[in-house]
Amino acid sequence: MGNQTSKKSQETSAKSVHYTTELRSYAAACKADTELQSFDTCLQARTSHVISTLATGVEVRALSFDSLKEVTQCLLEMNQEVVKVILDCKKDIWKNQEMFELVEDYFENSLKTLDFCAALEKGLRRARDSHLLILVALQQFEDESLVQGGNGYKKTLEELKNFKDAESPFNEDFFKMFQSVYKQQMLMLEKLQHRKNKLDKKLKCIHTWRKLSSIIFVATFATVLICSVVAAAMAAPPVAAALAAATAVPLGSMGKWIDSLWKNYENALKGQKEVISSMQAGTFVAVKDLDNIRVLIERLEIEITGMVKSAEFAVEHNAVKIGIDDIKKKLEVFKKNVEELGTQADLCSRDIRRARTVILQRIIKHPNNASSST
């Protein structure tokens, strides 16, 4: 018996220390959180009122029906306050409108960038056609050079004129499209960074978890206190034991449940952040690809303009040899720029498709079935 009494005393002491620590933590949290202060004020008022009402019952070792009704009402109201706080934090993060619109914008922008890549490919085909026209002109020049005096280089001049009059590989609409796509990608980077900053702040706000756990603990603690008074008033040891057993359960199970809720919340936030990071990486790569494409197009435009001027000079001044010599000097660089631009266009297209696949995989990895909060 002595050992059992000592053992019970140690357990009671351990529980007392645990509760004291929790209450101190709760008191500290109240000072830093206005919502928790409001909850605490309401809880204290209800608990004090009920205990005062029960005081008379304790003195006469009896409780009126009205007193029991008031106790029940108080416990229900406290429970409702706890539920309200939890539900405020229990919205599904993957149904968050801002996140949904952000992902939607990303995929829409990526499709527009793929459309630009298709337009770029058409421009490259026109550039290759121009290259073929130049090769034909050079061949005609070689053939006509075999004849005395070149026979006026009529066919060479005709091919040079065809090259000069050919449609520009990259027209005004193409450059407008490029500017629009580039601007949208830069804006996307800003939106993603803004959202990422918000997620970082949420992940750092661990006090939300502390507030929830404190609310659960103190509400349960108040319930235990009130039920203890009820048991004392009824002076029924079996009832007191039953109440003690019943009220001890929430302290552990509710704590585990709320901890699970917090973990789901944190995991959902991290899942969102993973998707944001993937979209950031994809957008950043797309912007870099577009920058490289712009540089290569500018180089190609310079080479095309130079060759067109040489062709114009040859046609207008009947100076075929001078024009052809200038074109020959520029042709190799032109061909190289076309090839590099084609490679970059293909790379940009592949990068965008790869990024879209990665982001879809991230979203699938973090489905909606995890009850999460925003």
From Swiss-Prot:
It is a multi-pass membrane protein. The lineage of its organism: Eukaryota, Viridiplantae, Streptophyta, Embryophyta, Tracheophyta. This is UPF0496 protein At4g34320. It is found in: Membrane. Keywords: Membrane, Transmembrane, Transmembrane helix. Belongs to the UPF0496 family. Its main location: membrane. One of its GO terms (cellular component) is membrane. It comes from the Eukaryota. Signal peptide: none annotated. The keyword Cell division does not apply. Pfam families: DUF677 (PF05055). The chain crosses the membrane at residues 215-235, 238-258.
